[in-house]
Amino acid sequence: MKRQPKKLLSIFLVLFLFLFICSCSIWSEDSVTDSDATYLPLDDSEYPYADLPRLVIETDNFRQINNKETKVPAHFQFYGKSKPSGPIQDLTIRGRGNSSFVMTKYGYKINLAEKISMLGMSKDKEWDLVSNFRDKSMVQNYITYQLAGILGDEYHPQCKFLELFLNRQYQGIYLLVEHVKVSKNRINIAKNDSSFLFEKTTETSTNGVLFTSSLNYIFKFDQPKEPSIHSQELLENHINEFERFLQSKSIYNLDSIAQWIDIEDFIRYYWIQEFTKNIDGHRRSIFLTWEKKDSINTPIKMGPVWDFDLGYGNSSDKKAVPDQWLIRNYGWNRFLFKNKEYKKRVKDYWEKNRAVFVATLDSIDSISRELAEASSNEFKRWPVLENDSGFPFFKKFSNYQEAVDALKNWIEQRIQWIDENL
């Protein structure tokens, strides 16, 4: 009986050692399974770690995401190479995008249960997972958002690349992007009935409040989302008055233009769209802000920039070639460019900032190197590199680097044409 305490102690030590070894084994495996209560399962045997963060999302009861309206409850967790890099947290997920949700590789909108920093970006609840499906270089949106920031845009969306696993299925490389919204860390305007974030669109069946301007352009209210009748009339009347001004002789006076718009802001936005020759750059996903403060009309501002997968020649549209002007021939620009002083300011802006636009070539080299390894996973999951059969694919490539080189070549030709035709 005297030896029993020692025997019990030995049994306890053996049991403790066994449990310790078992707990360590969770971290030693490349794949985490259902048996791990605090980790979402990740089987990466077919699509191995490729030096990008990995976002694992699992919907409740593996419910499918099949539209842009229904918010599906889910959980998420970030992974590093062989283990989670954060806790399991709650979110809702739904489809997103004007056309990306009709493609095979869906785009998603996620809403977190609480504001957190995602991959080092500013804290918020609302984020977009952009598929970049028809952009085979996968970098067009990324380099353009970075360009806007370098040029001094008041706000440009922060973004980071990751690989997405949804309901235990690998989905490919996505761009995690700040959702465009009014907030302190994003579009920092007041939240009241006389401060507006709105967008030019071509959608007439979209959710939200729309109005059609005197020039027959469709605009959607983003903030306030549910504007009062007074707010609707305030913005609609202001835009219509501005469009009447554009068609008047006053358009030839630059000081008069400055009473309506932030000229520097409009020119910066113009050049980003014109440089990329974004086919959507005069039609939709065009965000604007305007505020009426203490009965004073502030200038209309353009931005943030958004959605460039149809830029850089990535379209079947005959206008997608690297020569000729595009954006100045449409929308409000076709009136503004009648003013010679305004046109000179546009020319001066390019000459002053040309080096910044040229530097996008270095940006492409840098980010494409980061994506090179993961691109093997992407094009294994979605074997579309050689597909040029029509929407959404118009060009074919033998490998990822060829797609990157084609983008760089288009930009070089675009810069040369602009230089020769200012």
Predicted regions and their residues:
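Bacterial N-terminal signal peptides that target proteins for export
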Residues: 2-12
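Bacterial N-terminal signal peptides
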Residues: 12-22
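Bacterial Sec-dependent N-terminal signal peptides
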Residues: 21-45
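Middle-to-C-terminal accessory/interaction subdomains
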Residues: 52, 63-65, 86-91, 99, ...
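Conserved oxyanion/phosphate-binding beta-strand-loop segments in alpha/beta enzyme cores
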Residues: 72-131
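Internal "kinase-insert"/substrate-recognition segments embedded within catalytic cores
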Residues: 111, 115-117, 131-132, 153-157, ...
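A conserved alpha-helical element in kinase catalytic cores
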Residues: 133-154
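Short, well-structured beta-strand/strand-turn elements
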Residues: 151-163, 278
